[in-house]
């Protein structure tokens, strides 16, 4: 095995010391110089004597004359500077393949640029046009006669417009935009100053007499029904997507805010609820009507459980809340009413007491008991056997 390892290492060293002239290792700089001389039309005098000698030794350059090379060698021996030979090339064409005597572009006779008719300096134009595809006497753009710019009708200064339009695709007498007659801006009907509107509209896509937005008649803003100041609303709504008479939010009729039923001021509530997810007639926090704090919503104490608890604490119950009837989970607590403060304990009834539902910490389930017991057993086993 040792002999094999020594043999492998020795072989690697021998290959590394192998001569470089056996064709395996190539001088890249020489190859680059060879390619540059052989495959480019290069002036031999500009390369220097070394490159010329290399070209003579490695092969003839493309497009070179052997007689010229011999002449160059004789001239160099005589100490004279060789003159560069012109490469053999096809007849050079002028910029832009054109008709008779044209310097650039596909044009007709006497055209300096572009596909134009006679006497055109630039662009595809008719006679006497300086630029663009225009009719007679047009300075720029695809226009009708006498147009300075743009695709316009006669006498238009800019844009695709009808007669007498200064800018935009408009009808006669329109200063800007795609509008009807007499419109200053936008795609509008007659007499509209801005936007796509009906007659007499100052802005937006609106019906007659609307100042802004996509609205019905008499709407100041937004996509609304008649007489709505803002938002997508029904008639008489000031804001939001609401039913009639709603000030804000997605609500039913007469709702001021939020997704609510009729008469709800806020939140997702039933009818007549001011806040929270309470039932009907609940003011806040989901409390049942007339119940004190911590009553778990509208859940009333069970009468049977209250009676059983009263029997246990009858002797000690007073005007203060008793402890909760349970140590975990949901229980009940009681206290005397003010008018029953002086009653004897044995005379107390449920009508003499105030009751409340109390919630203690959640009771541990059977899974928790088993897991805790199992954990304790494992700890004891580890302690005993270690």
From Swiss-Prot:
Residues 293-303 have a biased composition (Low complexity). InterPro entries: Crcmsprzoite, TSP1_rpt, TSP1_rpt_sf. Its main location: membrane. Glycans are attached at residue 327. A lipid is attached at residue 363 (GPI-anchor amidated cysteine). Residues 51-304 are annotated as: Disordered. It is found in: Cell membrane; Cytoplasm. During host cell invasion, proteolytically cleaved at the cell membrane in the region I by a papain-like cysteine protease of parasite origin. Cleavage is triggered by the sporozoite contact with highly sulfated heparan sulfate proteoglycans (HSPGs) present on the host hepatocyte cell surface. Cleavage exposes the TSP type-1 (TSR) domain and is required for productive invasion of host hepatocytes but not for adhesion to the host cell membrane. Cleavage is dispensable for sporozoite development in the oocyst, motility and for traversal of host and vector cells. O-glycosylated; maybe by POFUT2. Residues 72-100 have a biased composition (Basic and acidic residues). The keyword Coiled coil does not apply. It is a lipid-anchor; GPI-anchor. The keyword Translocase does not apply. Residues 312-364 form the TSP type-1 domain. Belongs to the plasmodium circumsporozoite protein family. Essential sporozoite protein. In the mosquito vector, required for sporozoite development in the oocyst, migration through the vector hemolymph and entry into the vector salivary glands. In the vertebrate host, required for sporozoite migration through the host dermis and infection of host hepatocytes. Binds to highly sulfated heparan sulfate proteoglycans (HSPGs) on the surface of host hepatocytes. This is Circumsporozoite protein. It comes from Plasmodium simium.
